Regions:
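Active-site-adjacent structural elements that line small-molecule/cofactor binding pockets in enzymes
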Residues: 1-343
Length: 343
């Protein structure tokens, strides 16, 4: 099991980078860099590649709609070269509020687009001349442009032709696609004991089509982490606020994928209540309405013995990357302890 964390997109990027340098020394294996409608993730990942030596750097995630497939592939190849083979491309659909509201492009056919983007990226990394006919047409047909486009291949030799692709997937079809085509899966808001119950059929269907060369599917899981008693209250508040944001406000009513995943884990009534409160502007009440047992099982907050039990539950669910959001006076020291527990 590897140890990973995610940088918050609203934080100062320079301070984020300094924290990663310290966490790398403490044993962190992988850092994910988010991109919502904040600073772009690519700039910080390039900076991290220069500041770090060992830690893997993942895009967590690059929205599939905001870049062309070939630009996504070029960006991944460039970051992988700068980091000397430490980059992982995380892809995700984001949601219509961000894609249409901030980027101004239609949010349509996310699963089909993800499949084509994965295919195009891998073709670019193999330095093939890109010819693709689907939702994306490359080169552009003459009737849609000047008629001067021709198939091209990447100029540079990539550091790797098999840059790992991870997908943030919550819907059944997208999870199935991920299990079929991606090296890794980035689920969210999951109680580990519920992972198979919610996503088992989709994972099995995708795995049945999976190429042997991809190896077993890697999966992240974990949550807010605290083991010191004086940190329990702020850690639980951080977790509740984050859960309320995603379950209640990260998407319009009826199009909130996080709300759906929460409901499918046995919390249908609570999902509706949290969303109603959050969308009504009662964010603190939404956070308080989250069931205690969900907060306990979807985080790593408690005495060392309890946290080690939760890590064991993550491992039993098939989690390969323990994903932590640490709350501590001395974060590197906390990560060093957890590093020992998972080895």
């Amino acid at each position: 099991m590897l140890l990973s964390t995610q940088l918050q997109y609203g934080d100062d990027p320079i301070r984020n980078a300094e924290s990663v340098v310290a966490m790398e020394r403490a044993g962190l294996d992988m850092v994910w860099v988010a991109e919502a409608y904040s600073f772009d993730a690519v700039s910080l990942m390039g900076y991290l590649a220069a500041r770090t030596e060992r830690v893997q750097i993942g895009a967590g995630i690059l929205p599939i709609y905001s870049r062309t497939p070939t630009l996504t592939a070029m960006t991944a190849a460039g970051l992988d070269a700068l980091s000397q083979g430490r980059f992982a491309l995380g892809l995700g659909a984001s949601g219509p509020q961000v894609i249409e509201g901030f980027h101004g492009v239609p949010y349509d056919r996310p699963v089909a687009r993800t499949r084509e983007i994965i295919e195009i990226c891998r073709s670019v990394w193999r330095r093939e001349k890109i010819e693709h006919d689907g939702l994306y047409t490359i080169p552009l047909p003459p009737e849609r442009g000047t008629g001067l486009g021709k198939p091209l291949k990447l100029i540079n030799q990539p550091h790797r032709a098999d840059i790992p692709i991870w997908v943030a997937a919550l819907g059944e079809k997208n999870v199935q696609l991920t299990a079929e085509l991606a090296q890794g899966w980035l689920p969210h808001l999951m109680v580990p004991e519920q992972l198979r119950a919610v996503f088992g059929p989709a994972l099995d269907a995708g795995t049945a089509k999976r190429a042997a060369g991809l190896g077993p599917l890697q999966i992240t899981g974990g949550g807010v982490l605290a083991v010191d008693e004086d940190m329990f209250a702020p850690a639980r508040k951080r977790a509740r606020d984050m859960f309320a944001l995603y379950i209640g406000g990260m998407g319009a009513r009826g199009r909130n994928f996080y709300n759906t995943v929460f409901a499918r884990q046995g919390y249908a009534a609570e999902a509706e209540l949290v969303q109603d409160l959050y969308l009504d502007g009662r964010k603190d009440e939404a956070a308080a309405a989250l069931p205690d047992d969900f907060v306990d099982r979807a985080t790593l907050i408690g005495p060392p013995g309890f946290v080690r039990e939760r890590i064991a539950a993550q491992r039993a669910a098939g989690i390969t990357h323990l994903h932590v959001n640490p709350v501590a006076e001395d974060v590197p020291r906390l990560l060093s302890r957890v590093r020992e527990w998972i080895e």
